[in-house]
Design a protein with these regions (language model features):
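Conserved donor-binding/catalytic core segment of Leloir-type glycosyltransferases
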Residues: 37-53, 59-62, 75
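Aromatic "clamp/platform" in nucleotide-sugar-dependent glycosyltransferases that forms part
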Residues: 122
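A short helix/loop element that forms part of the nucleotide-sugar donor recognition site in Leloir-type
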Residues: 23-36
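Carbohydrate-associated surface elements
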Residues: 17
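A short, well-ordered alpha-helix in the C-terminal region of glycosyltransferases
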Residues: 182, 189-204
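Short alpha-helical donor nucleotide-sugar binding micro-motif in glycosyltransferases
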Residues: 101-102, 109-114
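Nucleotide-activated donor-binding/catalytic signature segment of Leloir-type glycosyltransferases, i.e.
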Residues: 86-105
C-alpha cells in the first residue's frame, strides 16, 4: 500500500459476517438420526474434497488417533474427489462417514453433534468453515494458512504450522494427530475453547456485527 501512496489510516477492514445458525438441538436425538452411537467421539471435516483442503493429511492423522481412541469417528461432509479419500482411507473406512454434500439444515445438525472441528487447509483465503464451527462451540484444530490464522486464535483452538517446501505445502501428520488427541484427553479445556470460539464469533463474525461495521464505515465517509 505504501508503494501506491495509500493512506493506511483511511483503510477499514471489515470481516465477513455469518448468520447465527446454532439452534441448540437435542444431540442425543440427532445422533440417533445420523446412526451415531452416544459413545463415539465425532471429529468433523466440512468442505470440498480436494488435496488443497489437506484431507489426505487428515485421514492419515485420524488413523493415528484411532490407535489411542478407537471410539472415534471422522465425519467428512462435502463433495469433490472421493477417489483420493477412499484410496487413503480404505483400511479405516468403517470409522469414517462420508455424508456427501449437505444442505444447511443437515450440516448444522452435524455441527451440533460433533466434538472437534478440523480445518486442515493448505490454503484458505477466509475461514468460513472455521467460523461455522466456532459458532457451534466446537474447539477447532486449524492450520496457520493466512485466512485461518486470522480467524482461529489460541483461545478457541489449536494450530498446525504448515511446512513450505520448494514445490509443495505439507502438514506434520504426527503433530495433527497429537493436537486431536490432546483435545480428546482434555475435554474441559476443549469445551472452554468451544465457548471462547462462540464468543469470538458473536463479537467479530456475526451478521449483525458485519452490518454495524458496514454502516459505521459508510457514515464515516460523509463526516
Amino acid at each position: 500500500m505504501r508503494n501506491y501512496g495509500i493512506d493506511i489510516a483511511k483503510i477499514s477492514v471489515i470481516p465477513n459476517g455469518l448468520q447465527d445458525m446454532s439452534d441448540r438441538l437435542d444431540s442425543i436425538a440427532l445422533r440417533k438420526k445420523w446412526n451415531l452411537s452416544a459413545e463415539e467421539k465425532i471429529i468433523l471435516f466440512a468442505g470440498r474434497f480436494d488435496e488443497i483442503k489437506g484431507i489426505l493429511f487428515l485421514i492419515k492423522a485420524f488413523r493415528n488417533v484411532l490407535k489411542i481412541y478407537s471410539n472415534c469417528r471422522l465425519i467428512m461432509a462435502g463433495s469433490g474427489n472421493y477417489d483420493i479419500c477412499f484410496q487413503e482411507a480404505k483400511d479405516i473406512c468403517t470409522k469414517i462417514t462420508f455424508t456427501g454434500l449437505l444442505n444447511k439444515k443437515d450440516l448444522n445438525e452435524i455441527y451440533q453433534i460433533a466434538d472437534i472441528g478440523i480445518v486442515p487447509s493448505l490454503f484458505e483465503p477466509f475461514g468460513y468453515v472455521a467460523i461455522e464451527m466456532m459458532m457451534h462451540e466446537l474447539p477447532v484444530v486449524a492450520t496457520t494458512t493466512s485466512g485461518l490464522n486470522e480467524v482461529v486464535n489460541n483461545a478457541c483452538g489449536l494450530k498446525i504450522p504448515l511446512t513450505i517446501l520448494s514445490e509443495s505445502v505439507e502438514i506434520d501428520v504426527m503433530l495433527l494427530s497429537e493436537k486431536i488427541i490432546y483435545l480428546l484427553q482434555h475435554p474441559i479445556e476443549a469445551k472452554l475453547m468451544g465457548q471462547n470460539g462462540r464468543k469470538r464469533y458473536l463479537d467479530n463474525y456475526a451478521s449483525e456485527i458485519f452490518r454495524i461495521n458496514m454502516v459505521k464505515t459508510y457514515n464515516s465517509l460523509f463526516q
